[in-house]
Amino acid sequence: MARYRGPVVKIMRREGVDLFLKSSYTFNKDKFHRKGPPGMPTKRKGKVSEYGAQLREKQKLKRAYGLLEKQFRRYYEEASHAHGVTGEILLQLLERRLDNVVYRLGFAITRRQARNFIAHRHILVNGERVDIPSYRLNVGDKVEIREKFKTSSFIADNIKLSQSLQGIPSWLSADYTNFGGDVTALPERHHIDLPVKEQVIVELYSK
């Protein structure tokens, strides 16, 4: 599947917010906070149209989870046909992706790194290797680091950094002694820290 592999700070500057795409070890806040989108001279901003504002919200969410338009649209279509609030269900579906859960548990410092771990078959789900980043987890599922990868300095460093920067969301439980974690509940809106207005995205796709 095609993926964006270019500079992630450029993406975050375009969206105007930190989308947690880059490790805090290397994140350059001076570059991020330069005025204006990348490649454009500083000038007074014009008024953003309603469509423009809706598009920016969609791009923020899509890029935060590393998705292309076709895949993101499938998540929206599924959410729109489910029972409940469409925007919140959309976020829930995205949070339940395996790459996101590996990131949320602190085994990877970005979702992009989590996808790499999964693609290289370093992640187990319920004791079986899974190499699909979009694999959807359910309540009761157990995520583990493959035995041979547990000694990697990546994992120990990532756990240490994650514990210092962010906690584990309450819908997950981590067992760092055994390099694993469990999905104990479905994520709710207040568990998700992304600065996105999901209802605006629903309005965009509803046109």
From Swiss-Prot:
Keywords: Ribonucleoprotein, Ribosomal protein, RNA-binding, rRNA-binding. GO terms for biological process: ribosomal small subunit biogenesis; translation. Pfam families: Ribosomal_S4 (PF00163), S4 (PF01479). One of its GO terms (cellular component) is small ribosomal subunit. GO terms for molecular function: rRNA binding; structural constituent of ribosome. InterPro entries: Ribosomal_uS4, Ribosomal_uS4_bac-type, Ribosomal_uS4_CS, Ribosomal_uS4_N, S4_RNA-bd, S4_RNA-bd_sf. Residues 96-156 form the S4 RNA-binding domain. Transmembrane segments: none annotated. Belongs to the universal ribosomal protein uS4 family. Part of the 30S ribosomal subunit. Contacts protein S5. The interaction surface between S4 and S5 is involved in control of translational fidelity. One of the primary rRNA binding proteins, it binds directly to 16S rRNA where it nucleates assembly of the body of the 30S subunit. This is Small ribosomal subunit protein uS4.
